[in-house]
Amino acid sequence: MKITSALVLLFAGVAFAQSADPNTNENKNVIHINSPSAAK
């Protein structure tokens, strides 16, 4: 259980760090995929 909770906290921390920095490549890819203009 400790290992599972540690992994959850790790992924949550990474996701929060990426969401806090809009200039990361990960967020650019997500925004591009989810943007309406990308579907055109």
Curated annotation (Swiss-Prot):
Keyword Heme assigned: no
Cellular component annotations (GO), alphabetically ordered: extracellular region; extracellular space
Keyword hit for Transferase: no
Reported function: Transferred from male to female during mating and may affect egglaying and behavior after mating.
Protein name: Accessory gland-specific peptide 57Db
Signal peptide, first to last residue: 1-17
GO BP of this protein: egg-laying behavior; regulation of female receptivity; sexual reproduction
Tissue-specific expression: Lumen fluid of male accessory glands, becomes seminal fluid.
Keywords carried by this UniProt record: Behavior, Secreted, Signal
Organism ancestry: Eukaryota, Metazoa, Ecdysozoa, Arthropoda, Hexapoda
Subcellular location(s) per record: Secreted
Organism encoding this protein: Drosophila melanogaster
